[in-house]
Amino acid sequence: ALDLKSGDVVADVGAGSGYFSWRMAQKVGPTGKIFATDIQPEMLELLMAQMRKRNVENIVEPILGTVQDPKLPANSTDLILLVDVYHELDFPFEMTRAMIKGLKPGGRLVLVEYRGEDPAVPIKKLHKMTTAQVKKEMAVHPLTFDRQIDVLPQQHILIFRKSANE
C-alpha cells in the first residue's frame, strides 16, 4: 500500500520497538534508509537491538525526537509513516510542521489511524480519528490530500503530499 522501492528514504515516527521499521527496511534495501524516531531512548535501544538481530542496523538510523519535532534531516525523506501515533501527539501542529520540513518536495506523509466514524471498531473514541478530522488538521499545512486506502479491518491509511514547491 505504501509503494516503497529500493533506495527510498523513510521515517517511522513513533517507531517504538521497530515493527514497521524492520519491514520497511526490507523494502528500501541497502541503498535506502529508515529514520526510526521516538521520544523514548529506551524504545530506540530496543529497536536497534531488534535491527541488529535482523541485520538491518546499517539501514535503520535511530533518532531521538521531542514531542514537537522528530528531528529529521531537512528535505531528506520520501515518506513519513505514523501508525496509531498522530492522535497521541501532544503538539500535533508543531510536530506536523517539523515533519513537513523533513519531507522532500512531493514527499508523502502517511497516517494510519483507527476509524473514528466506525462504532464497530472496539477502541476508545480518544484513540480514533475520522477522515474528516485528519483532513481538517492537515489543511493548515502545505500538504494536499492524495488518497485514502481502506485495506485494514479497523484503520484508515491516509496519504498526504508535500507541495512540490515547498
Q: Regions from the language model: what does each represent?
A:
Residues H141, D146-E166:
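Core SAM-dependent methyltransferase catalytic element
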Residues Q68-I80:
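A short acidic, Gly/Pro-enriched loop at the edge of an enzyme's catalytic core
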Residues T77-F93:
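A short SAM/SAH-binding and catalytic strip from SAM-dependent methyltransferases
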Residues A1-V9:
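Conserved alpha-helix/loop element of class I SAM-dependent methyltransferases that forms part
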Residues A25-G29, F93-R108:
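A short glycine-rich, Lys/Arg-flanked "PGG" loop and its adjoining helix->strand segment in the class I
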Residues A11-P70:
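Class I SAM-dependent methyltransferase SAM/SAH-binding core
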Residues D8, G32, G107:
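Glycine-centered, small-residue-biased loops immediately flanking beta-strands
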